[in-house]
């Protein structure tokens, strides 16, 4: 335990619920708890926390995001109208995911559970792709997806991750690629 407990946010509603702090904590001092509205926030166990600051370093909200200048911009849509109709992005995610899966990679994205919660899952078969298609207008649980992504990348697999900007930035920070 540390004399100075780490506080990630002054107001819990500043948190985007990406779970990066929980997944990076080597002491398992952080758990994500849900409020009455279903939003997830980190709770730090001061008995387990050693004050290393890993959670602060990986946080995409409490750190400045380096903005990059956009390069060339492309617009596209999937030619198959059935697939593009099931997608929110004109089918581009489906096209990219299909290619990654065909080449033996793994795809991560948000899917509804049987309880109609939304969580990030991984798929390895094209027939599972419809679960990831379409927008989900609620916060998704990341579970241990960042840990699995890191493991898959270390094993040399191609990984496609589809998420909202704060999740993508948190993943980059978690992987040390900011």
Predicted features and spans:
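Iron-sulfur-associated redox domains of electron-transfer enzymes in respiratory
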Residues: 66-178
């Amino acid at each position: 335990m540390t004399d100075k407990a780490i506080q990630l946010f002054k107001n819990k509603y500043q948190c985007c619920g990406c779970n990066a702090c929980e997944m990076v904590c080597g002491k398992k001092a952080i758990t994500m708890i849900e409020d009455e509205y279903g939003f997830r926030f980190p709770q730090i166990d001061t008995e387990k926390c050693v004050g290393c600051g890993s959670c602060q370093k990986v946080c995409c909200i409490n750190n400045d995001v380096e903005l990059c200048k956009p390069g060339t911009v492309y617009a596209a849509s999937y030619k198959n109208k059935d697939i593009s109709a099931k997608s929110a992005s004109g089918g581009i995610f489906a096209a990219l995911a299909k290619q990654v899966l065909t080449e033996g990679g793994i795809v991560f994205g948000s899917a509804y559970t049987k309880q109609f919660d939304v969580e990030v899952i991984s798929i390895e078969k094209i027939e599972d792709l419809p679960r990831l298609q379409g927008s989900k207008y609620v916060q998704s649980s990341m579970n241990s997806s960042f840990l699995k992504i890191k493991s898959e990348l270390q094993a040399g697999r191609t990984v496609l991750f589809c998420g909202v900007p704060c999740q993508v930035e948190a993943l980059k920070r978690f992987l040390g690629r900011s």
